[in-house]
Amino acid sequence: MTTIVSVRRNNKVVIAGDGQVSLGNTVMKGNARKVRRLYNNKVLAGFAGGTADAFTLFERFESKLQMHQGHLTKAAVELAKDWRSDRALRRLEAILAVADETASLIITGNGDVLQPEHDLIAIGSGGNYAQAAAIALLENTELDARTIAEKALNIAGDICVFTNHHHTIEELEIPQAMLPQGASA
């Protein structure tokens, strides 16, 4: 599978992923890009699961973003509705992590749209390792979002055989006006 991690801290949101594509117990590719920018570079998205399935979902999600003028939550809910009700989509095996300036969401194949706790998402085979590492770093350091995501992926890559150390990291800056009251850059 893979590991995707998203961290939101201060004025940044990051989604990062490794590059390993496995077929059974064989590594087929080590430098896949599982993290992308969508909707005029305003939305970050990463996937865990089947590569072909994820590309189908990326296309569908981007069309929902266009339809809803970039509104992340509306696009995610509409994609999840389609995923639940469309026979072909229901067969797709992937999970998406998406984020923009305002929200971070997980979209599952069961049709769930989840807003994570602690502004942290970790999905895929190494997700539990990355999540534990990122929580520890969020609670005990002042590291920025990118560094936390990178370190969490490195730890997951050291433990999970389906996660490697070839990372793709995308980052969005959150304008000061979009930050919660009392938060600073």
Swiss-Prot record:
Protein name: ATP-dependent protease subunit HslV
Subunit structure: A double ring-shaped homohexamer of HslV is capped on each side by a ring-shaped HslU homohexamer. The assembly of the HslU/HslV complex is dependent on binding of ATP.
Classification via Pfam families: Proteasome
Gene Ontology terms for molecular function: metal ion binding; threonine-type endopeptidase activity
Residues the entry annotates as binding Na(+): G157, C160, T163
GO cellular component: cytoplasm; HslUV protease complex; proteasome core complex
Keyword annotations: Allosteric enzyme, Cytoplasm, Hydrolase, Metal-binding, Protease, Sodium, Threonine protease
Similarity remark: Belongs to the peptidase T1B family. HslV subfamily.
Described function: Protease subunit of a proteasome-like degradation complex believed to be a general protein degrading machinery.
UniProt xrefs under SUPFAM superfamilies: N-terminal nucleophile aminohydrolases (Ntn hydrolases) (SSF56235)
Active site: T2
Activity regulation text: Allosterically activated by HslU binding.
E.C. number(s) listed in UniProt: 3.4.25.2
Cystine pairs: none
